[in-house]
């Protein structure tokens, strides 16, 4: 297919999605929830087909020499699929984010202003692997009244085709037009999708640093996403050793390919001699490769030396860098210099240290005495997430339903005109909030 043909075809797909989304935006909460329930049921019915498609994807990816972290994201086992379907049902239980009155203000008798939440329109979601991400995104899009055009990586094509086939079958039994969900599978379509600013309202890329930056640099459509997942745990001088070990191990090994897994462990010098041998043993038992700065090597001489590049590397694997710092201030400075503004944690029993850490670490998530792996839309109670945003502007952190809506101003009058409120005898506004 030529570039011109791809553009023409995708233009038609985008128009269909937008038309379907405009109808979805007008549906009742009950109708949307029925559609979400039908999607969950259809996914359950197609479970074997989806899992077999994923096995085929994994076999093909292995033959092509896929990187280990990406392979872990690609794998969709029965447990992951079950959790994803449960997440769909959880989204159905969430409050409808559409039609919420944010402002209701009388400007004058009979002249009322409202600010009401409404869908964004059409979402373009581009992701490299993680087929279960498609399931999460589709459920959130339906609940928030948005159409969605999915572009999966070549390694996950079979899995995503099976998922979208099931979703469309489920939607065909409801009031939601199946055209509200579309799937693209080629690189050429990715480039054309990024040019569809007439039809697509938001692009959400999920993938590697280089991938997200490519998207950001090649579209005029607003982009929501993060380019790195360099997270830290700082072990303060007042840390409880057992808590520190448990959190450090969980934050690294529970799922090292996740963007909220830690890549660097910062340790206060006064606790390092006691803490480091214990945590090193616990991590070694989980096959984690350790790298340390010069001071760490004095305590753990058997580990590899860390270099400057390690502080800015997202390993997404069983590798962890360790640095000893002299103070909380130094730890915060390191995080703000090398971190990705994703999620960072402090382990301490000192309340003042927590307040300082929370106030000065410029990340979307700042945690105390708990694992960075909690930075997740499902664990936050959002039902699911479309992605993580590390931007300074909202939405920030795990983005659920509230990040997929915008608002419009509605004003109702009885023939009111602006001239009444201007000039020498201007009538004053009442500006009374309901």
UniProtKB/Swiss-Prot annotation:
Family: Belongs to the gamma-glutamyl phosphate reductase family.
Protein's organism: Trichormus variabilis (strain ATCC 29413 / PCC 7937)
Enzyme Commission number(s): 1.2.1.41
GO CC entries: cytoplasm
UniProt keywords, alphabetically: Amino-acid biosynthesis, Cytoplasm, NADP, Oxidoreductase, Proline biosynthesis
Source taxonomy: Bacteria, Bacillati, Cyanobacteriota, Cyanophyceae, Nostocales
GO molecular function, one term: NADP binding
Protein name: Gamma-glutamyl phosphate reductase
Pfam families found in the cross-reference section: Aldedh
Pathway: Amino-acid biosynthesis; L-proline biosynthesis; L-glutamate 5-semialdehyde from L-glutamate: step 2/2
GO terms classed as biological process: L-proline biosynthetic process
Catalytic activity: L-glutamate 5-semialdehyde + phosphate + NADP(+) = L-glutamyl 5-phosphate + NADPH + H(+)
Compartments, record wording: Cytoplasm
Purpose: Catalyzes the NADPH-dependent reduction of L-glutamate 5-phosphate into L-glutamate 5-semialdehyde and phosphate. The product spontaneously undergoes cyclization to form 1-pyrroline-5-carboxylate.
Keyword presence, Cytoplasm: yes
Main location: cytoplasm
InterPro entries assigned to the protein according to its UniProt record, in alphabetical order: Ald_DH/histidinol_DH, Ald_DH_C, Ald_DH_N, Aldehyde_DH_dom, G-glutamylP_reductase_CS, Glu-5-SA_DH, GPR_dom
